[in-house]
Amino acid sequence: RRAWRAETRIRQHLQARQDGAPVQGYPSTNGLDALFGPVDPQAPQHSQRLACAMALRQLTCIITGGPGTGKTTTVMRLLALLQAAHGPSPLRVLLAAPTGKAAARLNASMAQAHAALPADWQTALPAEAQTLHKMLGWHGLATPLTGQRQLYADVVVVDEASMIDLEMMARLLQAVPTPARLVLLGDKDQLASVEAGAVMAQLCESPWLRNATATLTHSHRFGHDSAIGQWAQAVNTGDRARLQALWHQASTDSDPQAVGVSRWQAGANQHAMWGTAQV
């Protein structure tokens, strides 16, 4: 029953944000060209450009992608474009993540992405990220909904959104004022939160955010042709035959990544003997 109430509140808040005033004052494509270069579908940063262009036109959006696809880089460039459209007064930006460790990683990633901006686009860094609980002033289910604070912000960015459960997402949506933008970052293919609900994956397919979700596809950590890249793609698509073929290839390959994958598979097979389903 508690989960049903949280789902209902999420739907209501998303509908209210969708029915709110249309987004105004987003930059022209000149800003996108300055930060991402001219449109080139083959460019490694093309999916980042598309994500940024989408996010500029949405009050609530999701940017999803695997590790190393540039989610933080994209959101830093999004903030730079929003600041340019906002004028000389600084945007009120809040950064948050579900855990303290995730918040610390977000701070480090944002600082790195800020340093990579062109000099004439570098504005002040947002305030340091904090945990969602701290930002919302939430101390568990004992915190009454009527006592929850409203956030004072123009933009709220939440990283590792796949870790957010139903109740936390409902509280977050309630706390973000309708005029403020909400940007959720994460990997919809990542393991869901420990508590109830694979919320982020469901939001990506919801009628409110289906057209406000951008997927980053190019990994800047490893290529799609690498062993890890091929395994990740096969796992995400549920291609069992491809996984088996990659395993057999890895068992005779000298590539360090392939050797590592082969050892992982051997360990998984051994673990399967104790009752865990084999890949």
Language-model regions, residue ranges each:
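Interdomain "pre-motor" coupling segment immediately N-terminal to P-loop NTPase/helicase cores
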Residues: 1-27
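Hydrophobic positions on the alpha1 helix immediately C-terminal to the Walker A/P-loop
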Residues: 74, 78
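Hydrophobic anchor at the beta1->P-loop junction of P-loop NTPases
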Residues: 63, 95
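Walker B catalytic acidic pair
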Residues: 159-160, 186
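N-terminal pre-P-loop "Q-motif" helix
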Residues: 40-57
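Inter-Walker segment of RecA-like/P-loop motor cores
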Residues: 96-152
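Conserved helicase motor core of P-loop NTPases
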Residues: 50, 189-279
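Conserved lysine of the Walker
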Residues: 71
